[in-house]
Structure formats: structure tokens, C-alpha cells
Amino acid sequence: MPGSTDALEPRRPYEVFEHTADVGLHAFGRTLSELFIHAAQGMESLMVAPEQVRVQVSREITVTGHDEVSLLIAWLNELIVLFDTEYLLLRQFEIDEISGTYLKGRASGEPYDAQRHDIGSAIKAVTWHEAAVELTDEGYKVRIIFDI
């Protein structure tokens, strides 16, 4: 499988940072697939602690973009739409196919349950402000800011 969440590198897969009335994330991955998975994990962790979410349902996601940044923003915004429309909290992410302009993958989790889930930040959207995907000696790195 092109991307999985089984073996994480020693470095944390993502780091949260504060940004004037919003919140940001640096995510890291050895591959583009791993970067997108870690960015999704980081974003979802802002909404709910991952250990509170069971893997009960899965949704296939296909998005396109004109480059890696727009593709990542489309991927993350599609995950936000799943919460906004189906109240799905997500925990597990898989990338089946990815290029610089196309992604096909899956996101799995469960519907929000007020009895079990403590919601943190409500994310409205991923912003374009300062969004950048960078290839480094260690792999990929992204900086993204969320409108909360």
C-alpha cells in the first residue's frame, strides 16, 4: 500500500502551533503519502483525542489539486466536510494513490457521540495563508493554518 500509518519515524509526525486567532500545524513525512496522513492525524487531533475515536465506518475520498499544496488543502477540507455533514470523527487514514495533483484514499472513524467524545477546536477550514509543502533531506514537511 502506498501509504500507511504503521511505522512512524522517530520524529513526531506533527506539531501544533498557535497563530493569531487560528491554529497551525507542521506535519512531516518520509513520503508524500505519509505527509498527508500525518497532516490529517494532526488536524483531527485538534478536534478530539484520537484514543477516543473507534474505527467503525470508512469513507473513500478522491480529491484533485493543481499542485501538492492545493491537493493537501483539498484532502483536509474534505475531512472537515465529513465532520460537518456526517459528524464523523476520524482516526485512521490510508492513501491508495497519490501524485502531485491527485489523491485517492480512505478515512475511518465513527460518528460524534456527546457521551464519549470531548470536542476541542472546531475547525471551519484549512487556509491558504502561509501554506507550503517542502521537500527536505528527511522527507516532506508542511505548514498549514486552520480557521477555527
Residues covered by each model-derived region:
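N-terminal intrinsically disordered, cationic/polar leader segments
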Residues: 2-148
